[in-house]
Amino acid sequence: MSINIKDLIMKIAKENKIALNMDNLNIELKSLGIDSLSAMNLIMKIEDQIGVQLPDEKLLKIKNLRDLINAFEDVLK
């Protein structure tokens, strides 16, 4: 089963009324209006959907959408 992390992030963000734009993956989450609590909520929902948990060291490195996508793609390898 292949999981498209970008699509899953967009789906969960939309369900939670978080406006995301995948056009520029390097924009910091803070600049998108996503505070640390919203980011953790989003991450936990993604973890629940795909059945994995990100290690703490990966969580601490997530600053933008690219980091978020890469973190999940890495644990799914």
Curated annotation (Swiss-Prot):
Pfam families: PP-binding. Residues 1-76 form the Carrier domain. It comes from the Bacteria. Pathway: Lipid metabolism; fatty acid biosynthesis. The modification O-(pantetheine 4'-phosphoryl)serine is found at S36. GO terms for biological process: fatty acid biosynthetic process. Keywords: Fatty acid biosynthesis, Fatty acid metabolism, Lipid biosynthesis, Lipid metabolism, Phosphopantetheine, Phosphoprotein. 4'-phosphopantetheine is transferred from CoA to a specific serine of the apo-ACP-like protein. Carrier of the growing fatty acid chain in fatty acid biosynthesis. This is Acyl carrier protein homolog.
